[in-house]
Swiss-Prot record:
GO molecular function: rRNA binding; structural constituent of ribosome; zinc ion binding
InterPro entries linked to this entry: Ribosomal_uS14, Ribosomal_uS14_arc, Ribosomal_uS14_CS, RIbosomal_uS14_euk_arc, Ribosomal_uS14_sf
Key words of the record: Metal-binding, Ribonucleoprotein, Ribosomal protein, RNA-binding, rRNA-binding, Zinc
One GO term (biological process): cytoplasmic translation
Function: Binds 16S rRNA, required for the assembly of 30S particles.
Transmembrane segments: none
Binding sites annotated in the UniProt record for Zn(2+): C19, C22, C37, C40
Lineage summary: Archaea, Thermoproteota, Thermoprotei, Sulfolobales, Sulfolobaceae
The name this protein goes by in its record: Small ribosomal subunit protein uS14
Gene3D superfamilies from the UniProt entry: 30s Ribosomal Protein S14, Chain N
Cofactor note: Binds 1 zinc ion per subunit.
Record-stated family: Belongs to the universal ribosomal protein uS14 family. Zinc-binding uS14 subfamily.
Amino acid sequence: MGKYKPPAERKYGKGVQSCQRCGSKDSVIQKYGIYLCRQCFREVAYELGFRKYW
């Protein structure tokens, strides 16, 4: 193996936010301070008070 440089820690952007439920970093919903990925949001949306998903 050669030299290895670890990826830089991000301070902003898509790589910073992660889902609080599963830890996924893609398609995180930040609105209203939810911080859930779209898949987890669909599962718990009704419990959070969103009436569309039931």
